[in-house]
């Protein structure tokens, strides 16, 4: 983290009201300190959370989820050639997005204890209006292959219908 940027920090957007909760960790990439300070970052993360729970069966089971937000500042807003971001997100072929899954999981550990990380869904929101999206899933070493950690990369596209669809497709559908 450059000296003029705040350290990444975790907060809770929603706590499960029943059981231990299923953990989702939201984080952004290429959001500036100004966008964090003016509330843009948190507003985008809250929108993503609401879109996640806007479809069944997630709507009916919302009370079973813990939703965490990890706030990460980038040197600048958005993406430009030659600029590194905390999650190292990049657009690939077609609509694919890559990033540093290891970095995403490292930041997620600020919000979720290590013993709960094996089934976390990370939703990494790119500060970009370029359409795309990809989810990477990692099965656990043991047990049910339907379990495991995953990270969904989704751009914060301007149009609500597109962002909502991306969240539901990548995070709800694949994650």
Where are these regions (language model features)?
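Surface-exposed beta-strand edges and their flanking turn/coil or helix-capping segments
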Residues: 80-83, 137-139, 165-166
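Active-site scaffold of zinc-dependent metalloenzymes
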Residues: 94-109, 124-161
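Propeptide-to-catalytic entry region of secreted or membrane-anchored zinc metalloproteases
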Residues: 2-118, 126-131
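Structural recognition of the beta-strand scaffold that forms the well-ordered cores
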Residues: 23-28, 66-69, 121-125, 150-155, ...
């Amino acid at each position: 983290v450059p000296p003029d940027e705040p350290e990444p920090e975790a907060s809770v957007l929603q706590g499960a009201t029943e059981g231990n909760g299923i953990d989702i960790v939201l984080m952004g990439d290429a959001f500036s300190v100004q966008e964090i300070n003016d509330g843009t970052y948190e507003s985008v993360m809250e929108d993503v959370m609401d879109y996640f729970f806007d479809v069944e069966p997630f709507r009916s089971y919302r009370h079973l989820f813990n939703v965490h937000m990890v706030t990460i500042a980038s040197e600048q807003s958005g993406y430009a050639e030659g600029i590194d971001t905390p999650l190292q997100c990049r657009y690939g072929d077609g609509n694919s997005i890559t990033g540093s899954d290891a970095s995403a999981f490292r930041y997620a550990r600020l919000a979720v204890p290590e013993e709960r990380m094996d089934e976390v869904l990370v939703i990494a929101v790119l500060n970009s209006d370029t359409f795309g999206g990809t989810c990477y899933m990692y099965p656990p070493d043991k047990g049910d292959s339907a379990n495991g950690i995953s990270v969904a990369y989704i751009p914060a596209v301007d149009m609500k219908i597109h962002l909502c669809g991306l969240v539901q497709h990548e995070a709800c559908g694949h994650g």
